[in-house]
From Swiss-Prot:
Annotated organism of origin: Pseudomonas putida (strain ATCC 700007 / DSM 6899 / JCM 31910 / BCRC 17059 / LMG 24140 / F1)
Coiled-coil segments on the chain, per record: none
Region spans: Disordered: 61-81
Pfam families reported in the protein's UniProt record: YidD
This protein's name: Putative membrane protein insertion efficiency factor
Topology versus the membrane: Peripheral membrane protein
InterPro entries, sorted: Membr_insert_effic_factor_YidD
Keyword Nucleotide-binding: no
Family from the record: Belongs to the UPF0161 family.
Main subcellular location of this protein, as a coarse class: membrane
Compartments, record wording: Cell inner membrane
Keywords: Cell inner membrane, Cell membrane, Membrane
Length: 81
Protein backbone atom coordinates (compact mmCIF):
# COMPACT_ATOMS: atom_id res chain seq x y z
CA UNK A 1 0.00 0.00 0.00
CA UNK A 2 2.86 2.36 0.83
CA UNK A 3 4.45 1.83 -2.59
CA UNK A 4 1.12 2.58 -4.25
CA UNK A 5 0.95 5.92 -2.41
CA UNK A 6 4.43 6.80 -3.69
CA UNK A 7 3.55 6.29 -7.39
CA UNK A 8 1.81 9.68 -7.88
CA UNK A 9 4.72 11.46 -6.19
CA UNK A 10 7.23 9.69 -8.45
CA UNK A 11 5.13 10.54 -11.50
CA UNK A 12 5.07 14.21 -10.50
CA UNK A 13 8.82 14.29 -9.79
CA UNK A 14 9.87 12.70 -13.08
CA UNK A 15 7.14 13.73 -15.56
CA UNK A 16 5.64 17.04 -14.43
CA UNK A 17 8.24 18.78 -12.26
CA UNK A 18 10.96 18.97 -14.96
CA UNK A 19 8.54 20.91 -17.19
CA UNK A 20 8.01 23.60 -14.55
CA UNK A 21 10.39 26.08 -12.98
CA UNK A 22 11.63 25.33 -9.47
CA UNK A 23 9.13 26.98 -7.11
CA UNK A 24 9.79 25.19 -3.84
CA UNK A 25 11.20 27.39 -1.10
CA UNK A 26 12.48 24.46 0.93
CA UNK A 27 15.26 21.93 0.75
CA UNK A 28 14.54 19.10 0.15
CA UNK A 29 11.81 19.99 -2.32
CA UNK A 30 8.22 19.34 -1.28
CA UNK A 31 7.92 16.28 -3.51
CA UNK A 32 11.15 14.81 -2.12
CA UNK A 33 9.92 15.60 1.40
CA UNK A 34 6.56 13.89 0.75
CA UNK A 35 8.24 10.81 -0.71
CA UNK A 36 10.67 10.51 2.20
CA UNK A 37 7.97 11.19 4.81
CA UNK A 38 5.69 8.45 3.46
CA UNK A 39 8.62 6.07 3.06
CA UNK A 40 9.83 6.61 6.66
CA UNK A 41 6.57 7.20 8.56
CA UNK A 42 3.93 5.33 6.55
CA UNK A 43 0.94 6.56 4.61
CA UNK A 44 -1.02 8.28 7.39
CA UNK A 45 1.67 10.04 9.41
CA UNK A 46 3.89 10.64 6.36
CA UNK A 47 0.93 11.92 4.38
CA UNK A 48 0.04 14.32 7.20
CA UNK A 49 3.64 15.58 7.35
CA UNK A 50 3.55 16.14 3.57
CA UNK A 51 0.25 18.06 3.74
CA UNK A 52 1.63 20.26 6.52
CA UNK A 53 4.75 20.92 4.47
CA UNK A 54 2.73 21.87 1.39
CA UNK A 55 0.76 24.27 3.57
CA UNK A 56 4.01 26.02 4.56
CA UNK A 57 5.28 26.31 0.97
CA UNK A 58 3.99 29.73 -0.07
CA UNK A 59 5.46 33.12 -1.02
CA UNK A 60 5.21 34.54 2.52
CA UNK A 61 7.37 31.80 4.04
CA UNK A 62 11.14 32.19 3.85
CA UNK A 63 11.65 28.43 3.41
CA UNK A 64 15.08 26.95 4.01
CA UNK A 65 16.30 23.57 5.20
CA UNK A 66 13.38 21.49 6.49
CA UNK A 67 14.18 17.77 6.73
CA UNK A 68 11.67 15.02 7.48
CA UNK A 69 11.65 14.35 11.23
CA UNK A 70 13.18 11.02 12.17
CA UNK A 71 10.87 8.09 12.73
CA UNK A 72 10.30 7.36 16.41
CA UNK A 73 12.67 4.72 17.71
CA UNK A 74 11.34 1.59 19.31
CA UNK A 75 10.66 1.73 23.02
CA UNK A 76 11.80 -1.82 23.67
CA UNK A 77 15.49 -0.88 23.78
CA UNK A 78 14.97 1.57 26.65
CA UNK A 79 12.75 -0.88 28.54
CA UNK A 80 15.30 -3.71 28.28
CA UNK A 81 18.06 -1.61 29.84
Amino acid sequence: MRKLALVPIQFYRYAISPLMANHCRFFPSCSCYAYEAIENHGIWRGGWLAVRRLGRCHPWNDGGFDPVPPAPSSRTSSIAE
